[in-house]
């Protein structure tokens, strides 16, 4: 009897979860072309007609918050759609609609014998909104694809509702900044005094950030408390770093070659380059026991050692996770170093956060990404020994800025307090209690938590509207390095012209001209204020 009851319960649960599909079996052209988001079917039809008509400017209105920022803005021009594609779409047969737990739905359309479109929709703000398209191989496979992903889609949807909700009352935030905010340099130096390791989560090629770090470097308190600085450059180049800092004459070519070895096209962060030179200059004025040790932590392919396509494939397949390599190098260095002073790790904020969302852009193809270096180091060294700082940045992805953190709430607070540089603890603050949304994609993962789950401190340096353009190290592009990039492209089957949007022969002059023209007279985040 108990077994029978269990079977009945399981069957009931499965039936409740897997709602019976609603059969449609009509071609798209059988339905009117209207903008209607009232039901999953109508919303799916609306999305299909947006594709047929190339209406790029309407996708944001038809899509949910969790993908909206990726989509063209309202002034986007129509896309030209060829007649073959239009006919194919219009003749597609809408097979069925499935609703999952009243919040997730899909419309399955047979485009041709081999391609089934699965339009995914969520119920948000009283409307059924698009969150993307999946593909199936036949009707049954399309159902399986939808049901397999539906539970996670539902979790992301619930999280997106939380992330989307933002307070319009700034009083508590403004009061906290006024009561507890301190000067950023004092804040960072205090953290470096009280913690064996401070992780500074930065945004690359940001002059204001490197100027701040350089100012902190030259403060006498820094060399009293800090002996090691870890940087996000290739760890296999440590011997070259040691050679650079051991030299009695400033040899910038050593440093430039290190920068050229980071990624296939080099690393053109001028602020980091100048900071590393300033460490060399400072060390010349210090006794040996007070000098700063630079340790590189990133895992990158040793391109100069790779001579063939097969070398590249083997090296890439065996590449350790970047975050794990960073954590390994830091942990090992802290264990063996004789210098009792504390340490600073300067790394992109995407490698710094503490929550247990796996890191991005870190694992070799086919491998599961590990936790970030920040999360791993907290696990290994304890939360008390690691202090993680985030600087104020736009909301975005690894590909660029998309909007504002908490939809501009933090920016509004800093404006109300005079846009003066300030830093504060996130724990116990209204800022720390806000859902973490710095990384747009990651923010919809329920494991992301809030700001205090990811960082301990927050630093505001300047308003985003005043941000200088990317601080570019033009010096890395020499004629020999252009030849080396071409060689790297050949063994990796890549296209350098595509990377830099260059027609014809790739030259250093063309690369430099493209960057200078792109940034001339512009602020870095100008598109956010249009």
Question: Could you say what each language-model-derived stretch is?
Answer:
Residues 4-13:
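Sec-dependent N-terminal signal peptides
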Residues 22-38, 66-122, 133-136:
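Surface-exposed, charged secondary-structure patches
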Residues 27-55:
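Short, aromatic-enriched amphipathic alpha-helices that serve as compact interaction elements
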Residues 63-66, 101-103, 110-113, 122-125, ...:
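A mature extracytoplasmic/lumenal domain signature
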């Amino acid at each position: 009897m108990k077994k029978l009851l269990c079977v009945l319960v399981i069957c009931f649960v499965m039936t409740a979860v897997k709602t019976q599909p609603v059969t449609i079996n009509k071609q798209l052209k059988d339905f009117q072309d209207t903008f209607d988001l009232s039901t999953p079917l109508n919303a799916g039809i609306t999305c299909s007609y947006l594709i047929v008509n190339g209406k790029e400017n309407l996708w944001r209105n038809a899509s949910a918050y969790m993908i909206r920022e990726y989509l063209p803005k309202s002034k986007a021009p129509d896309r030209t759609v060829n007649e073959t594609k239009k006919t194919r779409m219009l003749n597609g047969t809408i097979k069925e609609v499935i609703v999952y737990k009243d919040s997730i739905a899909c419309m399955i359309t047979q485009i041709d014998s081999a391609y089934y479109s699965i339009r995914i929709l969520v119920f948000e703000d009283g409307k059924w909104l698009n969150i993307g398209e999946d593909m199936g191989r036949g009707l049954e496979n399309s159902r399986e694809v939808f049901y397999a992903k539906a539970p996670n889609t539902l979790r992301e949807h619930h999280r997106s509702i939380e992330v989307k909700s933002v307070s319009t009352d700034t009083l508590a935030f403004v009061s906290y900044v006024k009561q507890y905010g301190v000067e950023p340099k004092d804040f960072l130096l205090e953290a470096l005094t009280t913690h064996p390791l401070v992780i500074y989560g930065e945004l690359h090629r940001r002059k204001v950030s490197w100027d701040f770090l350089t100012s902190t470097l030259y403060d006498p308190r820094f060399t009293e408390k800090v002996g090691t600085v870890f940087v996000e450059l290739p760890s296999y180049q440590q011997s070259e770093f040691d050679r650079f800092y051991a030299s009695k004459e400033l040899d910038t070519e050593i440093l430039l070659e290190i920068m050229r070895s980071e990624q296939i096209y080099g690393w053109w962060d001028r602020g980091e380059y100048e900071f590393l030179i300033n460490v060399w200059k400072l060390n010349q004025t210090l006794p040996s026991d007070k000098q700063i040790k630079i340790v590189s932590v990133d895992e990158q392919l040793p391109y100069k050692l790779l001579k063939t396509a097969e070398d590249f494939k083997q090296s890439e397949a065996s590449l350790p996770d970047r975050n794990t390599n960073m954590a390994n190098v830091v942990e090992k260095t802290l264990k063996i170093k004789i210098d009792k002073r504390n340490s600073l790790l300067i790394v992109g904020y995407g490698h710094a956060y503490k929550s247990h969302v796996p890191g991005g852009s870190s694992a070799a193809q086919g491998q599961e990404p590990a936790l970030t270096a920040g999360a791993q180091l907290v696990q290994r060294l304890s939360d008390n020994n690691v202090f993680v700082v985030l600087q104020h940045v736009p909301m975005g992805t690894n590909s660029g800025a998309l909007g504002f953190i908490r939809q501009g709430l933090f920016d509004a607070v800093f404006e109300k307090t005079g846009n003066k540089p300030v830093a504060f603890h996130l724990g116990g603050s209204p800022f720390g209690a806000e859902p973490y949304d710095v990384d747009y994609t990651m923010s919809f993962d329920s494991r992301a938590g809030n700001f205090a789950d990811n960082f301990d401190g927050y630093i505001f340096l300047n308003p985003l509207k005043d941000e200088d353009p990317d601080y570019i190290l033009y010096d890395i592009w020499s004629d020999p390095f252009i030849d080396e990039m071409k060689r790297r492209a050949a063994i990796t089957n890549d296209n350098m012209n595509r990377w830099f949007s260059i027609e014809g022969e790739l030259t250093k002059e063309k690369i430099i001209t493209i960057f200078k023209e792109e940034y001339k007279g512009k602020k870095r985040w100008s598109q956010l204020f249009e």
